[in-house]
Amino acid sequence: MFIQHGFSTIISAEKIGRNCWINQQVTIGFSNDTESPLIGDNVTIYAGAKVIGKVRIGNNSIVGANAVVVKDVPANSTVVGIPACIVRRDGERVKELL
């Protein structure tokens, strides 16, 4: 795991997989004491993104800058926006709500 500029970055995850890249001002947090995110392998989370609650970020996925993720992200996907939506899945452009 690589955390770029760890200041203002909050991480409270159930698990973070291998080879993850987390940029500055990211929040990975829980919605209560038992609901923490689970981050898969080879995940990149860009600056300012928020991953909140008992959600899973699938392997090989990207969370775009300032995205707000409150639902599961499938493997091999890119999500952006508030609330986050899928814009790429398995290498193909899509537009899907989470």
Where do the PLM segments sit?
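C-terminal membrane module of polytopic membrane proteins
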Residues: 81, 97-98
